[in-house]
């Protein structure tokens, strides 16, 4: 098995992966702030990390994945004020959209902690930072992290603390303009919780430090998110967490690259934000997953009608190859393989190895997929005609491993589909008999019925095969 290597944003280099526990990988990924619909950029991160989790599991790791829900934040309060709705109504509505999108994309999360369910733990975390001299309380009741108390601040992002534009934060009550809020004092009309410093609510960065430590312990393996979170969010998380714990908090920082739309940055000002639920309705979960994972997670990806159509076509070709594989496997195996078949089998074994080599090299799904394409090509050009049983079995295993990671061909591997395949095979075989007897009207009628069910008949010289449309 190839050693597993991944790019660590902390250090900006490829490193050999070694989890704290050799059998378990603990991962925390920053989830959405639920004030609006999740969009296709969020979907890229959800599926990108899902591909990483799935490959880790394929290698035998037990993976614990935590992804938070930020359900109290400036943006949520602003949206509530704009709409005249209670902030909790806003949160519930968009949390439902988020959860439904995850389910559609077949992304499984072990823990989904919400900020408002961990207020006391956040308060305790902040108090400990105050006690250790890493945070200070202001006259307004806000609590700020003292960035100068953490000498390695900026190591993760490569940014200087002075570069941080903090927008609306109250600079005048801070020791330094770059200090950031751990606890925000209450303002009239805002939700609040009681604390030792008065009424208020958590700052953005403290919530992730608190909840990740709560569910994964004081040290865990992977902290992930979009590349836009490196600074200041993840930089601030690292500062406050390691200041409190006094040791390395996270081993590997992993970030997914930007998604653009027709080569332009996705933004509200350009009016080009595409809600994930709309993309799911248009393209379907499998095509979207396939499109996301066709590009390596650290490379930017551009959304366009053309690229999605290409993804749909490419996925269908793989499904067609799978149909041929199944048709060969159900035949009587030969007593031995000839030289041509043995050569094909060796090539498939080599390509399976290259698939794992690519996935082990910083989860390079794009290169891994290219090897699956080559196996599919062997199915179309060799196995389809030689009816090589062993070659088909090897290709079947390659597609099984591919689907374990990509999750785009689950139907082809589900038990219920085994029965359905047998039924369709029987119908097609009956049609072959009818064609042999030159009963073309009836055979054409069967073709029409199957077509209405989304099944396309492919007539050959001797017999017919089929595939899903």
UniProtKB/Swiss-Prot annotation:
Enzyme class: ligase
PANTHER family according to UniProt: CYSTEINE--TRNA LIGASE, CYTOPLASMIC, CYSTEINYL-TRNA SYNTHETASE
InterPro entries referenced in this protein's UniProt entry, alphabetically: Cys-tRNA-ligase, Cys-tRNA-synt_Ia_DALR, Cys-tRNA/MSH_ligase, Rossmann-like_a/b/a_fold, tRNA-synt_1_cat_dom, tRNAsynth_Ia_anticodon-bd
Motif 'KMSKS' region mapped to chain: 265-269
Organism: Sulfolobus acidocaldarius (strain ATCC 33909 / DSM 639 / JCM 8929 / NBRC 15157 / NCIMB 11770)
Entry EC number(s): 6.1.1.16
Alphabetical list of Pfam families matching this protein: tRNA-synt_1e
Catalytic activity: tRNA(Cys) + L-cysteine + ATP = L-cysteinyl-tRNA(Cys) + AMP + diphosphate
GO molecular function, one term: cysteine-tRNA ligase activity
Protein name: Cysteine--tRNA ligase
Top-level taxon: Archaea
Record: residues binding ATP: 268
Subcellular location: Cytoplasm
One GO BP annotation of this record: cysteinyl-tRNA aminoacylation
